[in-house]
Amino acid sequence: MSHGASSRPATARKSSGLSGTVRIPGDKSISHRSFMFGGLASGETRITGLLEGEDVINTGKAMQAMGARIRKEGDTWIIDGVGNGGLLAPEAPLDFGNAATGCRLTMGLVGVYDFDSTFIGDASLTKRPMGRVLNPLREMGVQVKSEDGDRLPVTLRGPKTPTPITYRVPMASAQVKSAVLLAGLNTPGITTVIEPIMTRDHTEKMLQGFGANLTVETDADGVRTIRLEGRGKLTGQVIDVPGDPSSTAFPLVAALLVPGSDVTILNVLMNPTRTGLILTLQEMGADIEVINPRLAGGEDVADLRVRSSTLKGVTVPEDRAPSMIDEYPILAVAAAFAEGATVMNGLEELRVKESDRLSAVANGLKLNGVDCDEGETSLVVRGRPDGKGLGNASGAAVATHLDHRIAMSFLVMGLVSENPVTVDDATMIATSFPEFMDLMAGLGAKIELSDTKAA
């Protein structure tokens, strides 16, 4: 499938032992929020380790369009924020490119302001559902103009005075939770979010760090109630962004699968809401050693030493899905080389990611000789530990559907399979992991971009 003039295929080939020590780019979730909260806070915020992928930069541009001053000195991003309640009406539509996180969180942040703000994005983002964020904003008094099915472009206009709400999040979505809390920042009174299934909690931790009056209670059933007092003061902070666990997954799984590998990955975010993949791989028999666990900016961080391992199939508990929703594509690749079947359930959220990620993974696996079954919300992969016959000798390419995680996952597969694996486009890897190709090559991975851009 062509993605227009700028797509560029890539091919990965069987590689021998990967080795080295690498530092992963900063966490995407924390990077988005660093720009947003720094832009909103009073005074100066300084950020090191920021993920400089296109998605995060688009969030920074949106904050600049609403009055924040952002500059870079050396490795440090310096933000002069507008003060809570001080965002200015953007003069042009806010373009978030491929970034659902930046788009949905900013809708919450600015939607309750008494002016018009318009949100646009690329072809992939324009297909994704925004109603999950727009519905609670409507309850707070926000007027919404959107395309059919609550898709982009979307224009929001807040009321003179927003209404605080108590909102029970209907699906496991940190973006919905965060959007409501961010809307609550500029709403008088207490905004309450009830979360039946815990999702990544960076918004809560970081807002507390910036000085918001925010409390979290968890009941006996694990239901979390988050209360935020609106219109309080946020104060600029110093943030060192830890390495993204979702990006860590690619060199980590490659090191587990390529025989003779020994790779150390530094400064990885180990927040318990994000470590579902590591836990699952350990259950499969992965040799992952957690070194030097420490706290940095209120978050758990550690270094990981990963050695090639013999994996066995497992059934992944459904309730683990929120803590590893972005990691199922690379888990499916690991499962393709495990002994026996790996069963993954509760995958409905994968159908509304950058692509229908579930069918994209299943189709890519089948194209490369893997025995798998795709259900409505499940995937079963039966592995072949020696990789015999896997890959695609004819060079047929996996359709990535503009999805960076599909591209990286299948390039990892090609490092282990008997035949090469080709993806139809690797350009969008830059949205989350611009250094991927160089970092993997430095460890000894054989991945080549095609010389010709696809038409």
UniProtKB/Swiss-Prot annotation:
* Pathway entry: Metabolic intermediate biosynthesis; chorismate biosynthesis; chorismate from D-erythrose 4-phosphate and phosphoenolpyruvate: step 6/7
Q: How is its activity regulated?
A: Is resistant to inhibition by glyphosate (glyphosate-tolerant) like other members of class II EPSPS, in contrast to class I EPSPS, which is glyphosate-sensitive. Is much less sensitive to inhibition by the (R)-difluoromethyl and (R)-phosphonate analogs of the tetrahedral reaction intermediate than the representative class I EPSPS from E.coli. Is highly activated in the presence of cations, such as NH4(+), Rb(+), and K(+).
Q: Which reaction does it catalyse?
A: 3-phosphoshikimate + phosphoenolpyruvate = 5-O-(1-carboxyvinyl)-3-phosphoshikimate + phosphate
What's the practical application here? Answer: Roundup Ready crop lines contain a gene derived from Agrobacteriums sp. strain CP4, encoding a glyphosate-tolerant enzyme, the so-called CP4 EPSP synthase. Expression of this enzyme confers crop resistance to glyphosate, enabling more effective weed control by allowing postemergent herbicide application.
Q: Which Pfam family is one of those matched by this entry?
A: EPSP_synthase
Output the Gene Ontology cellular-component terms.
Answer: cytoplasm
TM region(s), chain numbering? none
What positions does the entry give for phosphoenolpyruvate binding?
Answer: 28, 128, 175, 357, 405
Q: Which residues bind 3-phosphoshikimate?
A: 29, 33, 173-175, 326, 353
Keyword annotations for this protein, in alphabetical order, are: Amino-acid biosynthesis, Aromatic amino acid biosynthesis, Cytoplasm, Genetically modified food, Herbicide resistance, Transferase
The function of this protein is:
Catalyzes the transfer of the enolpyruvyl moiety of phosphoenolpyruvate (PEP) to the 5-hydroxyl of shikimate-3-phosphate (S3P) to produce enolpyruvyl shikimate-3-phosphate and inorganic phosphate.
Question: Which HAMAP family does the UniProt record give?
Answer: EPSP_synth
Q: State what protein this is by name.
A: 3-phosphoshikimate 1-carboxyvinyltransferase
Identify the species of origin: Agrobacterium sp. (strain CP4)
Its gene is aroA
